[in-house]
Amino acid sequence: MERIFNGSDLNQKTIFDHPSGLFVLFFTEMWERFSYYGMRAILVLFLTSSIMDEGWGWERKDALELFAAYTSLVYLTPLIGGILADKILGYRNAVVLGAFLMALGHGSLALEGIEQSFFYLGLGLLILGNGLFKPNISSIVGQLYKADDARKDGAYTIFYMGINAGAFLGILLCGYLGEKVGWHYGFGLAGIFMFFGMLQFYFAQGIFGSIGVKPTNKSTKSNSKDVDLSASANSNNKKVERDRILVIVIFSIATIF
């Protein structure tokens, strides 16, 4: 007997032959990447700009060390965030919480002119939020399809198009606003779009039905064998992704030292 498609009836509605939920994830990820790469585009420039230019006047070496440490932790925390989502939070709750923390983080960076501690608080919130957000939104994409669905590769291609579009727009707009108008405006714009992405996902998540909800013992016992096979395949995919992230972290740490 063919396994019933995951989620609700809404999930079975398609756009360009893909579940409509894919495009909710597409835009959520796009705005998150907008904020991430937009902030990264001006981080070192802000730190190395003179105090007269509203920067901190750091040496480039020191700024790059902070940048490297931040980037390394951004790749490390998804290992923890994926486990928390699997065991406790569920993928959707992890995505919402992670997006909220990142929106707060960008907002805190925008307040660096008031107090320098806001800057470091912002980086910390971004690291934690990314750990919850990044691995779990990708997992939801995989769960929109059966394990053997030929459309899954195309779905990830569409999803990564959102990543590229967000990165391009973030670097362009946040970079321009930060350099030409004010650094805090660049950080603030990143926060605005991250907050927008969070709201979009939060209010549209009903379209996913039961996909990505908080795990329970009851729901685990009631799953069919086909669902178990799908979950196993998804778990294997996540393990491969985490192994890749771990390799990146190791090389990033080696770069720092």
Feature annotation, model-predicted:
Residues 132-146:
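Intracellular juxtamembrane helix-capping segments at the cytosolic ends
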Residues 87-99, 149:
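Cytoplasmic membrane-interface "Motif A"-like loop-to-helix N-cap segments
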Residues 105, 116-133:
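Hydrophobic core of transmembrane alpha-helices in multi-pass small-molecule transporters
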Residues 1-24, 147, 175-257:
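Intracellular loop-helix junctions on the cytosolic face of multi-pass helical membrane proteins
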Residues 97-117:
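C-terminal ends and interior cores of transmembrane alpha-helices
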Residues 74, 151-179, 186-197:
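Glycine-rich segments within core transmembrane alpha-helices of 12-TM secondary carriers
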Residues 64-86, 134, 168:
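Central cavity-lining transmembrane alpha-helices of secondary-active solute carriers
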Residues 41-64:
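Short amphipathic helix-loop junctions that connect adjacent transmembrane helices
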